[in-house]
Each structure stands twice: as C-alpha cells, then as structure tokens.
Amino acid sequence: MALQKAGVDLANEICKNDPVRPNLPLGWRVAPCWKEVFYLPFTYFSVSEDRYHESIDAVLCVAHLNEIPISEDELLSFGHGNISVFYSVWSNRKGQGRQIIFDTMDLLKGQHSNNRYVTMSPKTEMAMKFHLSNGAVLLRENEETNNFEYK
C-alpha cells in the first residue's frame, strides 16, 4: 500500500510505540506544514477469521527545521525551515524502513522547497549500518546522535 500521512490523532496513537524517540511529546510531532508523521500501512486477509486486518509496516517522523539538530532539546526548540529532518524511523517488516525513507523523500521533493534531507539518528551501530547501506553520507558525529544526509 502507498505512503500515508497521519493526522494528529493517528500520529499520537502510532507514536506511543516509538522505539527511537519515546521521550518526545506526542502533541509536538504534528503541526501544519512543518512537522509530519508518515507511515506505510499493510493490509492482509485472515482466512481463519474471514476478515481483513490493517497494520503498520513502517513509520517516519519528519520536522522541517531551520537548523540541523544534534539533540532532542535542539529538535524541540529549532524553528520552521527548509531542512527536512528525519528524527525517528522504525519498521515492523524487513525492507520497509528503507522504503519509507525513499517514499517520503520522493513525496517531499514534490511538495516542499526543501533541498536537504538529514537524519538525527541514535548513535548506534544499527543506525550507522542502516543509513550508510541506504546511501546516506555521515554528515556529523555528535555526542548523543549522528546526522546523516540523503541526496
């Protein structure tokens, strides 16, 4: 199924389970034109129950900021701008984390004048391998995070 943009209520529900940035306030994550939550839905049919179920394959939280944050405090305090910051991404099925990043970038390129797509990623080996294997460049190593840039 195609990339979807979550409204406030759905974003709050989805982000309750954010494994990357669980401390960020739910109400902060969505604001018109500059803070968005995208997701990839997955629909399947259960033969035993004779009905369809919908789940979420992947989630990507984006803030369009005026600076590149290196901490959650900066993420929360920077203003609206033209840098798309991917600050939380997670998936429930293999390959869907990569898919949501590229689908979201394609969508944003058509909707915004933003020309930079940067992450604020946890400083983990898993995040490092994920972003580098998907073509991002390590932009900056910080004390608590790493910033990667996608072109």
Where are these regions (language model features)?
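Short, aromatic/basic amphipathic alpha-helical patches
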Residues: K129-V137
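Conserved beta-strand-loop-alpha-helix junction that forms the acyl-donor binding cleft
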Residues: V118-K129, E144-T145
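A short helix-loop-beta-strand connector motif used in the catalytic cores of GNAT acetyltransferases and
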Residues: V30-A58, A63-N66
